[in-house]
Curated annotation (Swiss-Prot):
It comes from Chloroflexus aurantiacus (strain ATCC 29364 / DSM 637 / Y-400-fl). Zn(2+) 2 binds at C1002, C1075, C1082, C1085. Its cofactor is Mg(2+); Zn(2+). The RNAP catalytic core consists of 2 alpha, 1 beta, 1 beta' and 1 omega subunit. When a sigma factor is associated with the core the holoenzyme is formed, which can initiate transcription. Residues 1439-1503 are annotated as: Disordered. The lineage of its organism: Bacteria, Bacillati, Chloroflexota, Chloroflexia, Chloroflexales. SMART domains: RPOLA_N. It comes from the Bacteria. Mg(2+) binds at D626, D628, D630. Pfam families: RNA_pol_Rpb1_1, RNA_pol_Rpb1_2, RNA_pol_Rpb1_3, RNA_pol_Rpb1_4, RNA_pol_Rpb1_5. This is DNA-directed RNA polymerase subunit beta'.
Length: 1503
């Protein structure tokens, strides 16, 4: 039947506003949810029935229309469509946003997709979106020019004005100076006049005084002076001297002198006055000049300032580019400078407008391509990142502006329910709170815009709306997370998807299922291997519907309702019905944790009393179950196909071998082993020892008459051969009459009893059977009966009768499994019986302390005392003392163990339990009877003080305290290890989940060389490693050269023996590592399925098996990165689980080893400070020979230096010989030899604690390890290539597991390593259209290159990438698988932008969308049916449809056919549709149409 779910790919992309509106059934405009009085949804609210559909089936909101007959009617009163209420799980609504908002995934992701597209840094983008900065969205170029001219004109006018003002000031200053100078001239003349007048007055005074004195002297002439006569203070005549003519002359002289002095003073005063005037004049002139200069400077300053201002404004105009981000201040300035020239805005609306106006994807792609070609380094890296986003948009058909939301979808109400609690309060999904915030803010914003509110208020409301939408989509991604009541962070849509509790992991990959139950398990020793005991009460509940149906069929109840009542009342008839229903019905048993596929197996249910599930003891190993309170879950496979699959594939008796290593996992253990060991022991001297019997029957008779002990050695004559070696004497006897070999063997009754229970081909085993021996019996039984050569036609027909006509290999597998299951059950019964009869148990008396122990301890104490003495004397260091003490006590512990071993009674229960492998080992017995020995402290360092006591003697308080360290560490270690191993398994499953066997043969010629085990005892023998592989090349006998086996032959046990016998030490086999299958693997590269021992079938999910095989034993690995002790190697060597993680995550290992970077010779150099350096010197010599023809002579000297292109010889007619090398030339007779040395050196500094592995002068190869430690796989890949790193990873992982005694087949690790190396990084894209640095699947890369080469283009080049499993999982082609693994939001963001198509090739993606997985029986549906089959089916459907039309109305049932748009087509159109499709197919057009449609639109379901 064609189904609407029958599509083969799913696509994710960005939703356009139109898409969101088309999904929606109405706009949500109110934040209300439900009315608290009526408890009915509010109209236009988040739960509105008009938008999302009715809350009750077939009933509208107001109750006008009730019942199904009104189906599809839309109520004219309340507007609700009458339909089923489940539409509320699928109908969406929408909110028209008052202002666009950005989608936070595309803004805040790393890298920010929106930021890359617009070439804006995430910080700036955030500032714009959250209204802190403006972004220019429009610049009017014509207005810009006008603005520029206006600015220039304005500044020119301002300059003119300033210059004019300065000129006026200059004139004013000049006039002032002229006036000042004129005034000074006048003042100077006035001063001169005053001086002249003053001196004239003084002269007159002197003349007047002289005249008066003369007159007096003339009066007194001829007399003696009676006193001194003075003239102006100068004596003219002294007292007593005569006054005469001379006296008058003297007076004239004095007058003359006085007048001269006066004249002198007058001249000086005039000169001083003139000088002062000149100085004042100069001062005034200087001040005027200074003022002029200041004026000039001020003018220049103002002009410069104007120039700068003008330049700045013009520059600001020049920077007015669309997309420029400006602050509030800058915006205001620019608005003032150039009003109306540009438009800047804030928020998501601005960004959306910018995208619509400026982003031309094609043009941008071309520009970025050119930049990648022309630039280097960081610029090129950025351009590549941007181009990746641009190309994603171009190829996907998404529009960049859809990253900004204008319409917000509202998810269906039943996905964000609101439920009433007991107290009348309501519990609601966080999403309702988040939606309510968005609606409130949106409505408020609408109102503010209508009211023309101030810009700042509107802007704030827009920012709050943006934040509300951010919180709804991904709460807490930016800023503080929105919290609800009680500080609890609200769960957003992103939180609904991601993490362990998210939609992917909680609901899509991990659904809870109906028809299941769980209970405690107890052992069911009487069950057969394929049975389990199911408590009746549990079975009745699980099979309730089946029982009810059976009661109605048998007439016990009239209808289902009565039957239900009968079952609930548990009437006696119910048990009979249950017995009938459950007969041959299979149930699945599962024990958590389900670490591998054997954790879920199918069993036939046997009804039992009680409440515990009974489990067969032999399947405990597969489930890792014990009976100390473990619980198991039961599941009922319902459909016929599920039952069939459970029977053919999951039944416990068909799961005998472990998929991890191919050995039996159904291995007897504990009591069974002990019983069989007890049976096959030989006790010399027991009752009847040495007796001889003519046959087995005779010996058994003697045993039954109690004449023999079960363990007594007796001689028996028997026919046939021995299986394997005997541990007792055997004597050959003459052949019997029919040619059968006969012998006389020494054996015991116990061994006869055991062999009686073995299948005839496995007899006669005459040796002590321990756990290993029982495992061999099971393995031999399976191998014998699954080998077609050993089966008769009758045996195969027997299987055919019960299992249908299958392939003979499959029949052999089924027969072998059933025979082995029978064998296991018989051994189980025998083991339990004789463990009981033997009565072996442990008591305190069985633990005997050996007498030797005390001597050993005393001796050790003496040795320790000697060491202490040496230390005190300073002969040894503290570290040496510690090492020696630890060594002494370790040796003492070893000797004690040996003493305990020797002291044990081999027939005692303790020794039997230990040596048989039933329980316990010699170390544990030694702790009870010997000494406990050394313990570790919390850091893992050994405490040098041992516990000398044992548990039999009892521990002292100190002993007990010291041993608690180790105990506690052990518990903590186990808890942590379990979580780590679980996470490792999850990552492994994720990386390999799409590795499925998809094709028969990929045809590759490549393969893997398997070599014989070298000195590494951890590696397995070649015979074991090549078993189940397929030869990649023919193999020949080493000496004779004859063909042993051709290519593509499976290496089975016989062929493996033949290959080794031929002397071959290595084989070239196919491997998952070299498989060329485009998806998954091919059968031949994988080889044998270890769980069946046969070649793997198509559809086997080998990736999951590999992951489980590696992850399941993870808990057995240690967590420690432990100390090797000693100074020689002080580095910690990572081992156990951390080392496995290191390998699979391809991390740089702890204690990394140095690798040689080139081939060459080692020189170890040590400098003065003791730092060691390894120098590798590589010298390659190239020679070129030039014969000298007749007439040629050299133009160079012997041993002279020459360079490439130099003429080294000349001949007749100007002929020349030119050298191709640069080096030294040697002339040897009639030829010239040019030799060139290519010299390379590498230096590596050795860490101080590293041990060097190489010697001075040793020759090393590139990639060779130079120091101890682990190699970095990334370096190894670079130096030695892909094959070397594959080999290294597989071997290193195996070393860790083997060191812990865990056996895993190589091919499982190879599958994981293949996935780690699946991707290549593009270096040069050629003509492929890929991007440099892009990671792409290697198969896809090969396909693209082949296509390009066939079209004559340039192929791309790429480098192999080694990715850790986490990174490889996230780089898978399936976005559903990657999103359900980790980083959900990032994966979905990328996938949406790229418009990714998931072709549903892996398992996870199919589980997520609810399809059958493409593995096992599920792959049969995927293998395309031929064209004719499809036509046949169409024709049959058409015929059925016509018959249905002709049938009476009451018997006719409508079978609507799905139409491509997902709606049901009307019944009457059925045959028209079918007929049209059939005609298309018959005309041969149908296929073409379909393929075209698929090419055009990958997300349409294939019809």
């Amino acid at each position: 039947m064609l189904e609407i779910n029958d599509f083969n790919a799913i696509r994710i992309s960005l939703a356009s506003p139109e898409d969101i509106r088309s999904w929606s059934h109405g706009e949500v405009t109110k934040p209300e949810t439900i009315n608290y009085r009526t408890l009915k949804p509010e109209r236009d609210g988040l739960f509105c029935e008009r938008i999302f559909g009715p809350t009750k089936d077939w009933e509208c909101f107001c109750g006008k229309y009730k019942r199904v007959r009104y189906k599809g009617v839309v109520c004219d009163k309340c507007g609700v469509e009458v339909t089923r209420s489940k539409v509320r799980r699928e109908r969406m609504g929408h909110i028209n946003l008052a202002s666009p908002v950005s989608h936070i995934w595309f803004v805040k992701g790393t890298p920010s997709r929106l930021g890359l597209l617009l070439d804006i840094s995430p910080r700036n983008l955030e500032r714009v979106l959250y209204f802190a900065s403006y972004i220019i969205v429009e610049v009017k170029e014509d207005m810009l020019q006008v603005a520029r001219e206006m600015i220039q004109e304005e500044y020119a006018a301002r300059r003119q004005k300033i210059q004019k003002q300065a000129e006026e000031k200059r004139i004013e200053l000049s006039t002032q100076l002229t006036q000042d100078l004129g005034g000074m001239e006048t003042a100077q003349r006035s001063t001169q006049r005053q001086i002249e007048e003053e001196y004239r007055r003084l002269r007159d005074e002197i003349a007047s005084e002289a005249e008066q004195l003369r007159e007096r002297l003339e009066e007194l002439s001829g007399t003696l002076a009676d006193e001194d006569i003075l003239f102006r203070g100068v004596t003219v005549v002294e007292e007593g001297e005569p006054i005469n003519e001379n006296t008058l002359d003297q007076l004239d002289e004095l007058v003359e002198q006085e007048l001269e002095v006066l004249e002198e003073r007058r001249r000086r005063d005039l000169a001083d006055a003139e000088l002062l005037t000149d100085a004042e004049r100069e001062r005034k002139a200087y001040e005027a000049t200074q003022e002029q200069e200041r004026l000039q400077e001020r003018l220049q300053r103002e002009l410069d300032h104007l120039m700068r201002e003008e330049k700045e404004k013009l520059e600001q105009l020049d920077t007015l580019k669309v997309g420029r981000i400006i602050t509030e201040t800058e915006y205001r300035q620019l608005r003032d400078i150039a009003p109306g020239v540009f438009r800047a805005d804030m928020g998501a609306g601005a960004v959306r407008e910018l995208i619509e106006k400026t982003v031309n994807l094609d043009k941008l792609a071309e520009e970025l391509q050119a930049e990648i070609q022309s630039s280097q380094g960081q610029r090129r890296k950025k351009a590549t990142k941007r181009l990746r986003v641009v190309e994603a948009f171009r190829k996907s058909g998404n529009r960049p502006e859809w990253m900004i939301l204008t319409v917000l979808p509202v998810i269906p109400p039943d996905l964000r329910p609101m439920v009433q609690l007991d107290g009348g309060r309501f519990a609601t999904s966080d999403l309702n709170d988040l939606y309510r915030r968005v609606i409130n803010r949106n409505n408020r914003l609408k109102r503010l815009i209508e009211l023309n509110a101030p810009e700042i208020i509107v802007r704030n409301e827009k920012r709050m709306l943006q934040e509300a939408v951010d919180a709804l989509i991904d709460n807490g991604r930016r800023g503080r997370a929105v919290s609800g009541k009680g500080k609890h962070r609200l769960k957003s849509l992103s939180d609904m998807l991601k993490g362990k509790q998210g939609r992917f992991r909680q609901n899509l990959l991990g659904k809870r299922v109906d028809y299941s139950g769980r209970s405690v398990i107890v052992v069911g020793p009487n069950l057969q291997l394929h049975q389990c005991g199911l408590p009746k009460k549990m079975a009745l509940e699980l099979f309730k519907p089946f029982v009810m149906r059976r009661l109605v069929e048998r007439g016990v109840a009239h209808n289902i309702k009565n039957a239900k009542r009968a079952v609930e009342r548990v009437r006696p008839e119910v048990w009979d019905a249950l017995e009938e229903v459950i007969k041959d019905y299979l149930v699945l048993l599962n024990r958590a944790p389900s670490l591998h596929r054997l954790s879920i197996q199918a069993f036939e249910a046997k009804l039992i009393e009680g409440s515990a599930i009974q489990l067969h003891p032999l399947v405990c190993a597969a489930f890792n179950a014990d009976f100390d309170g473990d619980q198991m879950a039961v599941h009922v496979p319902l459909s016929r196909k599920a039952q069939e699959e459970a029977r053919t594939r999951m039944l416990s008796k068909y799961n005998l071998l472990s998929p991890a290593h191919g050995e039996p996992i159904i291995t007897p253990s504990q009591d069974i082993v002990l019983g069989c060991y007890y049976l096959t022991m030989v006790r010399d001297g027991a009752k009847g020892s040495g007796k001889r019997f003519s046959s087995i029957d005779e010996a058994m008779l003697a045993y039954e008459k109690h004449l023999l002990d079960i363990q007594a050695p007796i001689w028996i004559r028997m026919t046939g051969t021995l299986s394997g070696k005997s541990d007792r004497p055997v004597r050959e006897l003459p052949l019997a009459a029919d040619g059968t070999p006969r012998m006389l063997i020494e054996t015991t009754i116990g061994r006869i009893l055991l062999n009686n229970e073995l299948q005839p081909p496995l007899r006669f085993r005459n040796r002590l059977i321990d756990k290993k021996g029982l495992k061999e019996i099971i393995a031999d039984c399976y191998q014998y009966y699954t080998n077609l050569r050993n089966l008769s036609e009758d045996q195969l027909n027997e299987v055919r009768a019960s299992h249908g006509n299958k392939h003979v290999q499959e029949l052999a597998r089924i027969y072998g499994s059933e025979m082995t299951a029978q064998q296991a059950d018989r051994i189980k019964a025998l083991g339990f019986r004789y463990a009981t009869l033997g009565g072996m148990t442990i008591g305190i008396e069985d633990i005997e302390v050996p007498a030797k122990k005390y001597d050993i301890v005393r001796e050790a104490e003496q040795l320790v005392a000697d060491v202490e003495k040496q230390f005190r004397r300073g002969l040894i260091t503290e570290e040496e003392r510690y090492q020696e003490v630890v060594r002494i006590w370790q040796e003492a512990t070893k000797q004690t163990i040996q003493a305990v071993k020797e002291n044990l009674n081999p027939f005692g229960p303790v020794a039997m339990m230990s040596t048989s492998g039933a329980r316990g080992n010699i170390n544990q017995i030694s702790q009870m009877a010997g000494m406990r020995g050394l313990m570790s402290d919390p850091t893992g360092r050994i405490i040098e003080l041992p516990i000398k006591a044992n548990f039999r003697e009892g521990l002292s308080v100190l002993d007990y305290f010291v041993s608690t360290h180790g105990g506690r560490k052990g518990l903590a270690d186990t808890a942590l290890r379990t979580a780590d191993a679980g996470y490792l398994t999850r990552r492994l499953v994720d990386v390999a989940q799409d590795v499925i066997i998809t094709i028969e043969d990929c045809g590759t010629e490549e393969g893997l060389w398997l070599h014989g085990a070298d000195d590494d005892e951890l590696m397995e023998k070649l015979q074991v490693r090549m078993l189940g592989r397929i030869l990649a090349a023919p193999i020949y006998h080493k000496e004779t050269g004859e063909l042993i086996a051709d290519r593509n032959t499976e290496i089975d046990e016989e062929l493996a023996t033949a290959i080794l016998a031929s002397g071959q030490e290595s084989v070239f086999v196919r491997s998952p590592l070299s498989c060329q299958a485009e998806h998954g693997l091919c059968r031949l590269c994988y080889g044998r399925n270890l769980a069946t021992g046969k070649l793997v079938e198509i559809g086997e999910a080998v990736g999951i098996i590999a992951a489980q095989s590696i992850g399941e034993p993870g808990t057995q690995l240690t967590l420690r990165t432990f100390h090797t002790g000693g100074v020689a190697s002080a580095d910690d060597i990572t081992q156990g689980l951390p080392r496995v993680q290191e390998i699979f995550e391809a991390r740089v290992p702890k204690g990394k080893a140095l690798l040689a970077e080139i081939d060459g010779v080692v020189q170890i150099v040590r400098d003065e400070e003791g730092v060691r350096t390894i120098r590798i010197v590589s010298t390659d010599v190239y020679t070129d020979e030039y014969p000298l023809g007749r007439g040629f002579s050299p133009t160079i000297n012997h041993e002279s230096e020459v360079y490439e292109g130099q003429v080294i010889a000349e001949g007749p007619g100007g002929a020349q010989i030119v050298t191709r090398l640069t080096g030294k030339a040697f002339i040897q007779g009639d030829r010239i030899i040019v030799s060139q040395e290519d010299h390379q050196e590498r230096e590596l500094v050795v860490p101080h604690n590293a041990r060097i592995r190489v010697e001075n002068g040793e020759r090393v190869m590139a990639g060779q390890q130079l120091t101890d430690g682990s190699a970095n796989p990334q370096e190894l890949l670079e130096l030695q290539g892909r094959e070397a790193v594959q080999r290294y990873l597989v071997n290193e992982a195996q070393k860790v597991y083997r060191s812990q005694g865990v056996n895993i087949n190589d091919k499982h690790i190879e599958v994981i390593v293949r996935q780690m190396l699946r991707r290549v990084r593009i270096e040069d894209p050629g003509d492929t259209g890929l991007l440099p640095g892009e990671l792409i699947d290697s198969a896809e890369f090969r396909r693209l290159n082949n296509d390009i080469v066939s079209q004559g283009g340039d192929p791309a080049t790429a480098a192999t990438m080694l990715l850790g499993i986490t990174k490889a999982s996230l780089n898978t082609d399936s976005f559903l698988a990657a999103a359900s693994f980790q980083e959900t939001t990032r994966v979905l963001t990328d996938a949406a932008i790229q418009g990714k198509v998931d072709y549903l090739r892996g398992l996870k993606e199919n589980v997520v969308i609810g399809k059958l997985i493409p593995a096992g029986t599920g792959i049969e549906k995927r293998i395309e049916r031929p064209h004719e089959d499809l036509i046949g089916e169409m024709a049959r459907m058409l015929e059925e449809s016509q018959q249905a039309e002709e049938a009476p109305a009451e018997t006719r049932r409508a079978t609507p056919l799905p139409t491509p748009n997902g709606n049901k087509a009307p019944e009457s159109d059925n045959d028209a549709l079918l007929r049209a499709r059939l005609e298309e197919l018959l005309s041969g057009d149908g296929d073409n149409d379909q393929s075209d449609a698929e090419e055009e639109d990958n997300d349409l379901p294939a019809f």
